[in-house]
């Protein structure tokens, strides 16, 4: 059988068969020029310097008056180079008195000599109408010359301490019900009080209901209480109410009104030239009320009250207290804490104990802004813990 294909000649060289794809490519070409690439921008996270430990401790106390931070209570805003941080406290039992409407009125305010007055307490004596809880061994005033001079007379109110300047760092109150489960009925309501505290609503009087005119404190008097006790609270945007048995879940804290916390300068004495409105001398009822719209009254008020903070008013609706049997009222344990920053003159003995204040103004401004934003809500009268929510209006 004849072969179908002729035998390939050996003299002709065999070439490799190219694929159709390879045939279309040119045998030689110039190298492709790459387009210039843009420089790659690498994002670098900013490196934050760690905050000074002393400043962090001070901010912890500024945010929470009950903080267990080991540092001194100071505001790290750079307004004081050297100062002393002081923490003063009051622990007392509150009980609604047998005669009355079974309501305890607790008012917290940013004061130097004391920070809480209670209306309707069983410890009221005489006709004063309220109980004053002053800080023990902390900034009292000798008003004996004014007491002896009488109403409208001249006299000196002298300081018993050597504090030159002061300002409030933080202040708060905790309340705990001491009654048993069978006697824990009752409720409370509270609001923030941001109105300007007028000077004529304050007075010098003896603290802790003691009869003394040489060591008085400065705080709200009965005139201020008479206008507040009957005020309708429910329409306030900061209104909060709750069961009395859950009051220990709340921390009532004064909030800053601005980021400016200026020091209050305290003179050694005030000369009250016709600046005394009322002088009542009757046992524990001793008090000196200042006249309204006088230079002395405004000077004293501006020096002893830090108006950069607001106030808190708590109205507690207690059990009936008949004084006998099972109706013995509502007993509450009050724990008040006031953190203050103090400055002394060079000639005072306390001056050598002053320490350098920390500086963290940016962190302080941020903490202050967050605190002021949080107080807008009605439930921010204090920190609500353990899942207990307040009875508040819907937003």
From Swiss-Prot:
The keyword Protein transport does not apply. It is found in: Host nucleus; Virion. The keyword Mitochondrion does not apply. A motif (Nuclear localization signal) lies at residues 2-9. GO terms for cellular component: host cell nucleus; virion component. Residues 1-41 have a biased composition (Basic residues). Residues 1-51 are annotated as: Disordered. Keywords: Host nucleus, Virion. Self-assembles to form the virion icosahedral capsid. This is Capsid protein.
């Amino acid at each position: 059988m004849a072969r179908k294909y002729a035998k390939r000649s050996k003299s002709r060289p065999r070439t490799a068969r190219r694929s159709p794809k390879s045939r279309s490519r040119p045998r030689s070409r110039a190298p492709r020029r790459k387009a210039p690439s843009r420089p790659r921008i690498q994002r670098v996270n900013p490196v934050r310097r760690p905050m000074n430990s002393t400043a962090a401790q001070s901010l912890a106390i500024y945010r929470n008056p009950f903080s267990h931070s080991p540092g001194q209570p100071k505001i790290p805003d750079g307004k004081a180079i050297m100062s002393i941080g002081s923490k003063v406290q009051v622990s007392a039992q509150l009980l609604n008195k047998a005669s009355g409407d079974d309501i305890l009125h607790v008012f917290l305010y940013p004061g130097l000599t004391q920070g809480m007055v209670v209306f309707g307490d069983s410890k009221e004596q005489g006709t004063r109408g309220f109980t004053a809880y002053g800080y023990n061994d902390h900034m009292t005033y000798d008003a004996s010359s004014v007491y002896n001079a009488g109403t409208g007379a001249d006299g000196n109110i002298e300081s018993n301490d050597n504090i030159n300047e002061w300002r409030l760092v933080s202040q708060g109150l905790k309340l705990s019900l001491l009654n048993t489960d069978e006697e824990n009925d009752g409720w409370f309501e509270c609001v923030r009080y941001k109105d300007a505290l007028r000077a004529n609503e304050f007075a010098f009087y003896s603290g802790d209901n003691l009869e003394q005119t040489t060591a008085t404190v400065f705080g709200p008097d009965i005139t201020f209480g008479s206008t507040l006790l009957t005020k309708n609270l429910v329409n306030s945007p900061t209104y909060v109410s709750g069961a009395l048995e859950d009051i220990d879940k709340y921390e009532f804290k004064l909030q800053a009104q601005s980021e400016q916390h200026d020091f209050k300068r305290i003179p050694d004495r005030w000369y009250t030239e016709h600046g005394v409105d009322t002088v009542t001398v009757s046992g524990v009822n001793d008090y000196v009320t200042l006249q309204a719209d006088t230079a002395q009254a405004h000077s004293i008020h501006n020096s002893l009250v830090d108006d950069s903070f607001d106030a808190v008013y708590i109205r507690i609706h207690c059990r009936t207290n008949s004084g006998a049997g099972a109706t013995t009222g509502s007993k509450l344990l009050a724990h008040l804490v006031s953190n203050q920053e103090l400055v002394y003159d060079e000639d005072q003995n306390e001056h050598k104990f002053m320490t350098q204040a920390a500086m963290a103004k940016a962190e302080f401004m941020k903490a202050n802004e967050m605190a002021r934003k949080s107080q807008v809500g009605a439930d921010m009268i204090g920190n609500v813990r353990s899942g207990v929510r307040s009875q508040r209006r819907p937003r």
